[in-house]
Amino acid sequence: AYGEGANVFGKRKETDQFFEISGDGWSGKL
């Protein structure tokens, strides 16, 4: 996801899914 940061804005769905996974991971650690 970070590697495709330039296209992240053009792929909102993929970004949302990525953030959901990342959010869950961070929530688990927090």
From Swiss-Prot:
UniProt keywords, alphabetically: Chloroplast, Membrane, Photosynthesis, Photosystem II, Plastid, Thylakoid
GO CC, alphabetical: chloroplast; chloroplast thylakoid membrane; photosystem II
Gene Ontology terms describing biological process: photosynthesis
Source taxon at top rank: Eukaryota
Subcellular location: Plastid, Chloroplast thylakoid membrane
Keyword Plastid: yes
Function field: May be involved in the regulation of photosystem II.
Family per similarity comment: Belongs to the PsbP family.
Protein name, as recorded: Oxygen-evolving enhancer protein 2
Protein species of origin: Euglena gracilis
